[in-house]
Design a protein with these regions (language model features):
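Terminal targeting signals and extreme-terminal segments of soluble enzymes
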Residues: 1-141
């Protein structure tokens, strides 16, 4: 499979994924893996000093999707979320910096299954775990 380079992926992400920067998600690549971080700010809160679950779900969807992109999307293809689930295990609090990482579980011809975790390294706690299914497709103009 001819996977696109990280530079090619970054160009596509900048054109198609405008929501992550809106939330303040920062993306970096280490050892050919996507790592995403988010510092919990006041606009992320859903309860006093606690990050809203929707913010965590958005970060998880991004972690799962970009992990799929980096590992399994051939040149000329895109991927979209078919479904995903999330288990909330601990709270992320105002001021916490949380980190999201993903791994591929299954790679088929048109579907990819990815697992992810979001954790707070400073507090040594797992915030949530997720799993998603992604559809590979060619762009139709």
């Amino acid at each position: 499979m001819n996977i696109m380079s990280l530079e090619e992926l970054e160009k596509i992400i900048k054109k198609t994924n405008l929501f992550d920067p809106y939330l303040g998600i920062i993306r970096e690549v280490k050892d050919n893996k996507i790592i995403q971080t988010l510092k919990i700010a006041e606009n992320h809160l859903g309860a006093p000093n606690t990050c809203h679950g929707g913010v965590l779900a958005s970060l998880m969807d991004s972690v799962l999707g970009l992990t799929t992109w980096v590992d399994s999307v051939p040149k000329g293809f895109y991927c979209s979320t078919v479904e995903f689930k999330i288990n909330y295990l601990n709270r992320a609090m105002l001021g916490d910096t949380i980190i999201g990482k993903g791994t591929i579980v299954h790679r088929g011809s048109s579907l990819v299954i990815t697992e992810g975790v979001i954790y707070c390294e400073e507090k040594n706690i797992l915030i949530c775990k997720g799993m998603g299914t992604f559809n590979l497709y060619t762009k139709k103009d």
